[in-house]
Amino acid sequence: MVQGPTTHRNLDDSPAGPLLILSPCAGTPTRVPAAPDAPDFRLPCHFGRPTRKRGPSTPPLSSPGKVCATGPRRVYSVTVCCGHCGKDLTFAVKTGSTTLLGFEHLLNSDLDLLCPRCESRERHGKR
């Protein structure tokens, strides 16, 4: 389900299904922003601070502005809540519209994202 811009409505504690709001950012910057100011979509998961890759750096898969098979790639701000504690977190993704709908399906079906606190608890066997 794709909806329009973010609203400030209060939803009940047990919605019928996950809320997903998708919208592209105003421009397509050359680097992915930290995403607090961008329009967003919401899902029932949470993501922590991006981790740094170790080892040699790899070049980007596509050049900025390149059109992929699913259409032009745009930057989307994603707001999700933790699959364990429900805290909100916002992060950015850059993708085409078809891939974004596949990402939505994955998050709605089989993927629970965890906040750093819950991830640490899961890793150390605390619940």
UniProtKB/Swiss-Prot annotation:
Name of the protein: Protein E7
HAMAP family per record: PPV_E7
Domain topic, free-text comment: The E7 terminal domain is an intrinsically disordered domain, whose flexibility and conformational transitions confer target adaptability to the oncoprotein. It allows adaptation to a variety of protein targets and exposes the PEST degradation sequence that regulates its turnover in the cell.
UniProt entry keywords in alphabetical sequence: Activator, DNA-binding, Early protein, G1/S host cell cycle checkpoint dysregulation by virus, Host cytoplasm, Host nucleus, Host-virus interaction, Inhibition of host innate immune response by virus, Inhibition of host interferon signaling pathway by virus, Interferon antiviral system evasion, Metal-binding, Modulation of host cell cycle by virus, Oncogene, Transcription, Transcription regulation, Viral immunoevasion, Zinc, Zinc-finger
Zinc finger extent (unnamed): 82-118
Free-text function comment from the UniProt entry: Plays a role in viral genome replication by driving entry of quiescent cells into the cell cycle. Stimulation of progression from G1 to S phase allows the virus to efficiently use the cellular DNA replicating machinery to achieve viral genome replication. E7 protein has both transforming and trans-activating activities. Induces the disassembly of the E2F1 transcription factor from RB1, with subsequent transcriptional activation of E2F1-regulated S-phase genes. Interferes with host histone deacetylation mediated by HDAC1 and HDAC2, leading to transcription activation.
Region (E7 terminal domain): 2-56
Motif Nuclear export signal positions after renumbering to this chain: 100-108
Region (Disordered): 33-66
Coiled coil location: none
Predominant cellular place of this UniProt entry's protein: host cell
Quaternary structure note: Homodimer. Homooligomer. Interacts with host RB1; this interaction induces dissociation of RB1-E2F1 complex thereby disrupting RB1 activity. Interacts with host EP300; this interaction represses EP300 transcriptional activity. Interacts with protein E2; this interaction inhibits E7 oncogenic activity. Interacts with host TMEM173/STING; this interaction impairs the ability of TMEM173/STING to sense cytosolic DNA and promote the production of type I interferon (IFN-alpha and IFN-beta).
Gene Ontology terms: biological process: DNA-templated transcription; symbiont-mediated perturbation of host cell cycle G1/S transition checkpoint; symbiont-mediated suppression of host innate immune response; symbiont-mediated suppression of host type I interferon-mediated signaling pathway
GO cellular component: host cell cytoplasm; host cell nucleus
Name of the gene this protein is made from: E7
Organism: Bos taurus papillomavirus 2
